[in-house]
Amino acid sequence: MASNEDFSITQDLEIPADIVELHDINVEPLPMEDIPTESVQYEDVDGNWIYGGHNHPPLMVLQPLFTNTGYGDHDQEMLMLQTQEEVVGYCDSDNQLGNDLEDQLALPDSIEDEHFQMTLASLSASAASTSTSTQSRSKKPSKKPSGKSATSTEANPAGSSSSLGTRKWEQKQMQVKTLEGEFSVTMWSPNDNNDQGAVGEGQAENPPDYSEYLKGKKLPPGGLPGIDLSDPKQLAEFTKVKPKRSKGEPPKTVPCSYSGCEKMFRDYAAMRKHLHIHGPRVHVCAECGKAFLESSKLRRHQLVHTGEKPFQCTFEGCGKRFSLDFNLRTHLRIHTGDKPFVCPFDVCNRKFAQSTNLKTHILTHVKTKNNP
């Protein structure tokens, strides 16, 4: 059974005030505090080079360049000079600001660093050229510079001269030796000892030739000055046979650039060819592990292991065979009786077919002289 519900619709219904009780709401006022304000004056950046202008020249920044600490450079720090791009067409006032910045350039503690001095020299030259080109591009150049500009122009060269000194630089060829070989590079070095280098270069001579003492000339009673025949190295150099130089052959005036080598050559091409001797020995014998500079020397050495002896003595009744032609030539002296090596001591006239035998014989004289 559905219930009956009554609905009534009223318009502009108002609730009497005596039925609903209204309460007053108290609103507290908000405290008012004075906040201090600052007036900020912004600089006119229309002419600033950072915002597209050109009143300020490019700044020069010294940035630290940290090296790899894995190679022992823990306490070393390099300075890298970095400049911003040059802005063309700036006015004379910019040049004055650039001169002021030169006096504020940061310098390292040690001004004796040659590489840093060279960099400063190039920077000073660049600043001077920039100043000159700016004055030439001026629309109305003044005939007589102002006192301030003249003082600044005259003071800058003096300052750079006092800081950089009178050192001159030149390019030199340096030999660099690596695991793969030796090569030459061009480096800048101070030209402080030009006179000493010229004197040393003029005094460079060919190493002394003692071959005449092996052919019959006798030694002086006091011996050769600066030569100790008891030293195996000096004795080997003394008994070393040097090739004869023809009369028309030019003198050898180019020294070997390798440290410790005193050989001389006719030209730089011959010296560069000789430098391969000081290079790495990459051709290794698989039998004994001996290394050689050239593959031809390795092939000649391998004859010792194979037992091959292609060089045979042609004298009747001999028939000896040798692996090297040099050994065959030395052997032939036995048949010919040729003994080109003569004892250089005055009291001895013995002769030998090989220089090694003469070297052994000289040691007997040296031992007798040192132990009378």
Swiss-Prot record:
Region (Mediates transcriptional activation): 32-102
Tissue expression per record: Expressed in kidney, liver, spleen and testis but not in colon.
Chain spans, region Mediates transcriptional repression: 237-372
SUPFAM superfamilies, alphabetized: beta-beta-alpha zinc fingers (SSF57667)
Key words of the record: Activator, DNA-binding, Metal-binding, Nucleus, Repeat, Repressor, Transcription, Transcription regulation, Zinc, Zinc-finger
Disordered: annotated span: 126-172, 186-210
Subcellular location per the Swiss-Prot or TrEMBL entry: Nucleus
Comp. bias intervals (Low complexity): 126-136
Keyword Nucleus: yes
Polar residues biased stretches: 154-165, 186-196
GO annotations of cellular component type: chromatin; nucleus; PcG protein complex; transcription regulator complex
Compositional bias of kind Basic residues: 137-146
GO terms of molecular function: cis-regulatory region sequence-specific DNA binding; DNA-binding transcription activator activity, RNA polymerase II-specific; DNA-binding transcription factor activity, RNA polymerase II-specific; RNA polymerase II cis-regulatory region sequence-specific DNA binding; sequence-specific DNA binding; sequence-specific double-stranded DNA binding; zinc ion binding
BP GO terms, sorted: positive regulation of transcription by RNA polymerase II; regulation of transcription by RNA polymerase II
Keyword Endoplasmic reticulum: no
Superkingdom of origin: Eukaryota
InterPro entries on file: YY1-like, Znf_C2H2_sf, Znf_C2H2_type
Pfam families: zf-C2H2
ZnF (C2H2-type) intervals: 254-278, 283-305, 311-335, 341-365
Miscellaneous note of the record: The gene encoding this protein appears to have arisen by retrotransposition of the YY1 gene in placental mammals. It is encoded by a single exon found in an intron of the gene MBTPS2.
Main function: Functions as a multifunctional transcription factor that may exhibit positive and negative control on a large number of genes. May antagonize YY1 and function in development and differentiation.
Family: Belongs to the YY transcription factor family.
Protein name per its UniProtKB record: Transcription factor YY2
